[in-house]
């Protein structure tokens, strides 16, 4: 099945990402949570017909999660031997694929320097577990994503950031958002879609003012909401997809107020 492509009224977002990819530059997608950064990376992967290996960063990310690990395997002769299982970084390098590092600023700063040689002109790494020197084959590219100011994120190391070219990815809106809702959700009623878009605009404004978290205004939450509206009242759908995810009562009340204004 064909991938539902990333869309943005600002065509330079995708066009510049594609141009950087063609130049084999490391791309850092920077923007609010749920703005479509992963969708943009997936679309690039499909457009250039190159598979993508994904790393999801967290404070628990370690070198083994990136590069791979040793394990015991029984060979064809029935004997046990120690083998190395390639992780996403080494797989992408050996196969000439895309490496996508999601939420790179969630990782502990001391975990990522192992990638320095991968991200600069050398495009190579010495596997600390085997001693093997791996040089990336043609086609290998790196895309990373960052949610600045999100809970749990850390300032990105300058030496690491300098290895990337940055593209800002903001939320989509207007007719583009309307088309995305129709293509990627079950909701098709134009009047309801217009109401939802206006409601989402209010959430985005509140998010920028710090009244609610970014996730409440994300495209992911919006598409879930549109699906639920087709099977339940809009107020209950908003409660299930947005309000009940929030812990702060003030954030919840702010969204209840927006519901009263829009529906």
UniProtKB/Swiss-Prot annotation:
CDD domains: AAA
GO molecular function, one term: ATP hydrolysis activity
A Pfam family assignment: AAA_5
SUPFAM superfamilies: P-loop containing nucleoside triphosphate hydrolases (SSF52540)
Comment field (misc): Disruption of this gene leads to an increase in hla (alpha-hemolysin) transcription and proteases production.
UniProt family annotation: Belongs to the CbbQ/NirQ/NorQ/GpvN family.
The protein's name in its UniProt record: Uncharacterized protein SAOUHSC_01413
Organism field: Staphylococcus aureus (strain NCTC 8325 / PS 47)
